[in-house]
């Protein structure tokens, strides 16, 4: 068990993670359009892994590497956790990009992807991870809020949406895998292994689908990187969204109920909309504003201790009886 102050710190780390992911949405979109989705995911992951190598050395030198593996079993657990996280991350991000490429609208893609906040507690039941009533109530409210925020009122379902929904399933697995391994190993080290795994696994599909597996195809693919905007997007996504964001996720999830963690990270949708307002001078509609308010309310409700709510209910009943 970790202390309450540590839980608050880790919750704030997950909110910061959502903020980084939300703001990085524009960079990810531009980078994927410039060099191809598979290339973008592969390169950003490898960059993130490289960036974390000196970070690990620095943390060890400063004495913050508290879970540096000593025994062979600890190293095995670290490598296993990193590889499992990397495979789940690769499959989830690839499924999401394929769904968007097949035609899922960005708003619907955001909603379907964020449905992992509903899937995590459901899958967690099979792993004997119980959730209190407040958490379930918060999940339902958050899903409604996400619908208002991301959807335009259409409820049609296309084939591409199935791929995006698969992405939500895979991200649920990713969150639960992190929940299992994060208390056992050093989060930064596991994140580093995760990114190298994701990047290396992504090389083959990148070569087949983006490069065209021919000399001329590779030459044409290389010319895409002459665009400075492409590199800016890749570097930002690699360093911030991946290197910083996913590492904060692994560190922040330690000791946090995975369902609550998924709800905190679903703030990515809210921050992406707010970033559009601040950076791109867009405007929030009434529908989007209601969605943001519902998501924030859901997160607050999910954090309330069940005992506190019961006590409040008892006090209310006593007050009514006195009247």
Where are the regions a protein language model picked out?
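C-terminal-most transmembrane helix of multi-pass membrane proteins
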Residues: 45-46, 53-57, 230-232, 266-323
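Glycine-/small-residue-enriched transmembrane alpha-helix faces in small-molecule transporters
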Residues: 1-43, 91, 95, 155-180, ...
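Specific transmembrane alpha-helical segments of multi-pass solute transporters/efflux pumps
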Residues: 24, 56-112, 146-148, 237-256
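Helix-helix packing/entry segments at the starts of transmembrane helices
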Residues: 18, 43, 109-115, 178-200, ...
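Specific alpha-helical transmembrane segments that line the substrate/conduction pathway
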Residues: 39-50, 97-130, 167, 258-277
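Hydrophobic alpha-helical transmembrane segments of multi-pass integral membrane proteins
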Residues: 8-13, 39-58, 136-141, 159-163, ...
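Hydrophobic transmembrane alpha-helices of multi-pass small-molecule transport proteins
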Residues: 52, 131-151, 168-171, 202, ...
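Transmembrane alpha-helices of multi-pass small-molecule transport proteins
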Residues: 34-91, 117-123, 170-177, 192-213, ...
């Amino acid at each position: 068990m970790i202390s309450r102050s540590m839980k608050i710190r880790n919750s704030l780390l997950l909110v910061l993670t959502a903020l980084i992911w939300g703001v990085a949405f524009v960079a990810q979109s531009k980078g994927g359009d410039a060099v191809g989705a598979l290339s973008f995911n592969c390169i950003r992951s490898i960059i993130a892994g490289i960036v974390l190598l000196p970070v690990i050395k620095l943390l060890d030198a400063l004495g913050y590497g508290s879970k540096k593996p000593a025994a062979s079993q600890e190293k095995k657990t670290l490598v296993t956790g990193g590889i499992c996280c990397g495979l789940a991350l690769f499959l989830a991000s690839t499924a999401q990009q394929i769904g968007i490429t097949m035609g899922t609208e960005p708003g619907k893609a955001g909603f379907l992807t964020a449905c992992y906040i509903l899937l995590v507690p459901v899958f967690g039941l099979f792993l004997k991870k119980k959730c209190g009533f407040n958490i379930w109530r918060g999940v339902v409210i958050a899903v409604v809020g996400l619908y208002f925020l991301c959807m335009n009122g259409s409820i049609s379902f296309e084939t591409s949406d199935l791929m995006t929904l698969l992405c939500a399933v895979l991200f649920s697995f990713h969150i639960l895998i992190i929940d299992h391994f994060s208390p056992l190993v050093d989060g930064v080290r596991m994140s580093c292994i995760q990114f190298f795994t994701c990047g290396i696994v992504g090389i083959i599909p990148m070569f087949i689908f983006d490069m065209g597996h021919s000399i001329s195809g590779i030459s044409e693919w290389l010319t895409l990187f002459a665009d400075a905007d492409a590199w800016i997007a890749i570097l930002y996504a690699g360093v911030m969204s991946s290197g910083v964001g996913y590492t904060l996720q692994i560190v922040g999830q330690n000791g946090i109920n995975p369902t609550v963690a998924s709800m905190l990270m679903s703030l990515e949708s809210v921050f992406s909309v707010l970033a559009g307002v601040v950076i791109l001078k867009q405007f929030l509609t009434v529908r989007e504003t209601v969605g943001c308010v519902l998501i924030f309310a859901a997160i607050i409700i999910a954090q309330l201790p069940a005992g506190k709510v019961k006590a409040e209910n008892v006090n209310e009943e006593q007050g009514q009886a006195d009247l």
